[in-house]
């Protein structure tokens, strides 16, 4: 792979205007009067050097957050016609930019003096504005509007100084997902996390369409300009070299992935009844915010404990569980067994399974289980195969055809496995990166759920465990 080669930057900053003096400039924001023969646009980086008594030169870096233009000399809106059309009033066109302070070097927080020259950053001043001069391990992740690369400090991603990545942007147009995948491609290609980076594993949940099932194929529509940009970033415009694809098993006796555009190279995933019980996956059937208030989670905890206590593997049939002498070969078998204890057709619910809850709560619990049987029943079967997250560098789990209920179950079950494995080993490396789109759906601000608890654990303890979350 070609090393990252940064384009040759301009040697010196280019003057674009002066700091306005008709209104106060502050330590956090100031305005620039733009020269007639120049321009500033949104997100441009600006530097102002100002002399501070007893401190010397202070460089103030900022980013353009707004650009405005006006006639200077008019007082009323109707003066626009007199100036522009009739020519009966004299006025000058002025353009100004609002700049928000990003960095001050040295860190003496003062406001820029009015009339100081404002320049567009370039070369070393650009590095200083973006803190790139302090990045020991900087990873190129894209380009700014000036055509120069932008970087992130890997130390703040991989757990050295911080962890996790949050991507914000417009929803529904796949821009956040596209950036997240490009980031993963650059991260794995540059091995920026060496020595651990070479063994990094990424888990990607595909929630929209089947586009991500083609990450190992070439882009037939890539342009020469895009190839050149990838080359500048130090990565060839090639697909991910190491990817595994997983999709939910299709309804029926065969282990066939439920996909449409691609079958080759896609594995079907499911869980055995024994895994479902022993790993306590029942709790991921109760992930709605109202379940906690309705005491459904209270019954679920007691039922889960009873199942684990009374469960043993069937020695003759791998994956089949035996609970109280009853073989459990499907989710339907398990629901029937639970119903005998929680909501029997004749008699009272067993205290060990339900505790002291109203009868209606037990009935609501069983209604949820019967609904779950129809939604995820095919995912619980003997001979099932769990997602193998470590087989390749990138693991794509396709859940876009599942209902919201089933998606929450799969995400919860897989994340729980990731967290449990990392806790068991106690080792940060190899790092496990998780890309989860629509993060707010799984961890809403209000309410409680097992998935939210798992994600909070990852956010709080993932840095020390080597689990890095990318949320979009």
Give the positions of each predicted feature.
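Long, basic/Gly/Ser/Thr-rich N-terminal segments
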Residues: 1-135
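P-loop NTPase motor domains
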Residues: 192-197, 204-205, 209-213, 239-460, ...
């Amino acid at each position: 792979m070609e090393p990252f080669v940064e384009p040759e930057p301009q040697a010196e900053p280019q003057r674009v205007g002066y700091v306005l003096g008709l209104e106060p400039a502050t330590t956090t924001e100031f305005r620039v009067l733009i020269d007639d023969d120049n321009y500033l646009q949104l997100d441009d980086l600006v530097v102002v050097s100002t002399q501070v008594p007893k401190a010397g030169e202070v460089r103030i870096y900022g980013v353009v957050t707004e650009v405005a233009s006006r006639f200077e000399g008019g007082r009323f809106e109707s003066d626009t016609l007199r100036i522009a059309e009739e020519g009966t009033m004299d006025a000058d066109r002025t353009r100004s930019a609002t700049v928000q302070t990003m960095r001050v070097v040295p860190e003496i927080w003062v406001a820029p003096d009015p009339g100081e020259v404002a320049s567009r950053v370039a070369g070393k001043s650009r590095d200083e504005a973006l803190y790139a001069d302090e990045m020991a391990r900087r990873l190129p992740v894209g380009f700014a509007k000036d055509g120069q690369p932008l970087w992130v400090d890997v130390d703040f991603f991989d757990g050295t100084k911080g962890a996790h990545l949050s991507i914000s942007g417009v929803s529904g147009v796949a821009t956040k997902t596209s950036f997240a995948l490009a980031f993963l491609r650059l991260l794995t290609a540059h091995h920026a996390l060496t020595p651990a980076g070479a063994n990094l594993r990424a888990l990607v949940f595909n929630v929209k369409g089947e586009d991500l099932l083609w990450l190992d194929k070439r882009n037939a529509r890539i342009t020469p300009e895009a190839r050149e940009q990838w080359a500048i970033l130090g990565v060839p415009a090639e697909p991910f070299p190491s990817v595994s694809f997983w999709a939910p098993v299709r309804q029926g006796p065969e282990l066939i992935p439920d996909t449409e555009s691609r079958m080759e190279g896609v594995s079907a995933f499911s869980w055995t009844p024994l895994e479902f019980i022993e790993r306590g996956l029942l709790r991921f059937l109760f992930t709605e915010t109202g379940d906690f208030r309705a005491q459904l989670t209270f019954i679920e905890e007691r039922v889960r404990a009873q199942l684990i206590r009374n469960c043993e593997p069937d020695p003759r049939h791998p994956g089949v569980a035996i609970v109280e002498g009853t073989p459990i070969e499907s989710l339907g078998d398990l629901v029937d067994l639970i119903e005998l204890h929680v909501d029997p057709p004749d008699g009272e619910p067993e205290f060990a399974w339900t505790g002291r809850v109203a009868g209606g709560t037990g009935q609501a619990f069983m209604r949820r289980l019967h609904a779950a049987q129809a939604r995820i029943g095919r995912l619980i079967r003997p001979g099932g195969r769990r997602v193998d997250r470590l087989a390749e560098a990138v693991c794509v789990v396709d859940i876009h055809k599942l209902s919201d209920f089933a998606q929450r179950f799969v995400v919860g079950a897989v994340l729980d496995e990731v967290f449990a494995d990392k806790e068991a080993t106690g080792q940060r490396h190899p790092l496990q990166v998780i890309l989860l789109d629509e993060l707010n759906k799984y961890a809403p601000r209000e309410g409680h759920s097992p998935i939210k608890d798992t994600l909070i654990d990852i956010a709080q303890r993932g840095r020390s465990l080597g689990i890095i979350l990318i949320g979009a």
